[in-house]
């Protein structure tokens, strides 16, 4: 599939290509692809919203995610690499399909759970960690985008808490059902080994074994993402003994 963003749309002065540039290229590619999937998700969400304010909010989020993707592409150019994106890559396509099943059911709450609670928890935690170790403006960009994504989670919490207050058992069952679908895919994506083959985003071999060279690891990113996810579920009021069991059953 052709990339959704023109990676050569503007001329930015590049720094010299460092030995770690190919690693950051793949990290950026995963992040950029995730942002474009999020933009597609929010655009689809706008189409099922009845409230004009909700439509405008979803479209604003979509524009923000496209801006994040463009920022990641720009950071790649600064270090002399082209950042690819592939929203049809194996895992990202599955995540997109999970969201679109909620769209097909016109399940607004389900859409919020998938995008704002599950996918955004992953983004906030992983971007925050990358932001701490990536050099210069690359780290600053990841940290800044993590902070913006955190606002998306905060925005959804009031809506979802109100929904849970109507029927906690029904709400928790919905979250668990979506967890089995979406979080299983995310867990596989962050597993130590890609047991299902190449992820179709990394430009060469899987980047995960090389993450140690830039003070990262797949296990660390997975752990941070799951901790953020559990914290978010706790903020919703879902019992911790239940959510810990859910996470313990995810593939490793």
Describe every region a protein language model picked out.
Residues 1-252:
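Non-heme di-metal
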């Amino acid at each position: 599939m052709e990339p959704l963003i023109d990676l050569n749309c503007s001329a930015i002065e590049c720094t010299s290509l460092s030995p770690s540039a190919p690693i950051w290229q793949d990290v950026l590619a995963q992040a950029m692809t995730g942002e474009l999937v999020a933009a597609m998700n929010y655009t689809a969400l706008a189409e099922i919203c009845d409230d004009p304010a909700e439509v405008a909010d979803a479209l604003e989020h979509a524009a923000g995610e496209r801006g994040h993707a463009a920022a990641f592409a720009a950071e790649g150019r600064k270090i002399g690499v082209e950042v690819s994106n592939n929203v049809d890559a194996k895992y990202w396509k599955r995540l997109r399909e999970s969201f679109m099943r909620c769209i097909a059911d016109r399940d607004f709450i389900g859409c919020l759970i998938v995008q704002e609670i599950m996918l955004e928890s992953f983004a906030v935690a992983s971007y925050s960690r990358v932001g701490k170790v990536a050099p210069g403006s690359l780290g600053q960009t990841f940290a800044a985008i993590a902070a913006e994504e955190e606002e998306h989670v905060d925005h959804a919490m009031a809506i979802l808490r109100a929904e849970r207050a109507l029927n906690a058992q029904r709400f928790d069952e919905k979250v668990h059902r979506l967890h089995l679908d979406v979080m299983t895919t995310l867990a596989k994506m962050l597993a130590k080994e890609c047991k299902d083959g190449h992820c179709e985003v990394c430009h060469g071999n899987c980047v995960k074994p090389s993450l140690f060279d830039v003070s990262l690891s797949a296990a660390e990113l997975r752990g941070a993402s799951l901790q953020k996810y559990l914290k978010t579920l706790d903020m919703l009021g879902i019992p911790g003994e239940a959510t810990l069991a859910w996470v313990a059953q995810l593939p490793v």
